[in-house]
A protein has these predicted regions:
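A generic structural motif
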Residues: 38-42, 85, 123-127
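Short, hydrophobic beta-strand segments
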Residues: 34-35, 80-82, 117-122
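Conserved PLP cofactor-binding pocket of PLP-dependent enzymes
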Residues: 73, 78, 101-118
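Generic non-transmembrane alpha-helical segments
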Residues: 57, 61-65, 93-104, 137
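Conserved PLP-binding catalytic core of the aspartate aminotransferase-like
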Residues: 69-98
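Active-site C-terminal subdomain of aminotransferase-like
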Residues: 1-66, 73
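PLP-dependent enzyme catalytic core of the Aspartate aminotransferase-like
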Residues: 111-139
Length: 139
């Protein structure tokens, strides 16, 4: 069998889709590569550094709130915290309500056998103050 539609058209030009692990799967690295090619590594570096800064700012804000406890300091842009006095059902209900009203996507997870909340920052346009305002309203 020969599938001519799979042949490389231009063998002299580098094409990232030729490096997919299987021809039946899309080249998952292509969107990232394209974004790097368009925006450049300096903008990516700045965006990543900004999300790390957001995570640190939010962690510091959580530590200042008496009703919250920072469980795990940020690793890259992910942190864990708990609301003092809440149980698993409380976390589930709050998380669902917050997602439905569009205020925040903050989902429960389990850390060392305890239900906690997880925040992962990936959007450099996220504003620390808005996140902290939502968390402050958990009182």
């Amino acid at each position: 069998q020969h599938a001519s539609y799979l042949d490389q058209i231009d063998r002299d030009a580098w094409n990232p889709s030729d490096y997919a692990t299987q021809l039946t799967r899309r080249a998952r690295g292509l969107p990232f590569w394209f974004s790097l090619a368009v925006h450049g590594t300096d903008k990516y570096r700045a965006a990543v550094e900004h999300t790390l800064s957001i995570a640190r700012d939010v962690a510091a804000g959580i530590e200042a709130m008496p009703h919250l406890e920072l469980v795990k300091h940020p690793e890259l842009s992910v942190l864990l915290f708990r609301r003092r006095g809440w149980n698993t059902a409380d976390y589930q209900a709050w998380s669902q309500a917050a997602a439905l009203d569009g205020s925040i996507l903050c989902v429960p997870t389990t850390w060392r056998g305890q239900t906690v909340l997880r925040l992962a920052f990936t959007n450099p346009d996220t504003e620390s103050r808005r996140v902290l305002d939502v968390l402050d309203a958990m009182r």
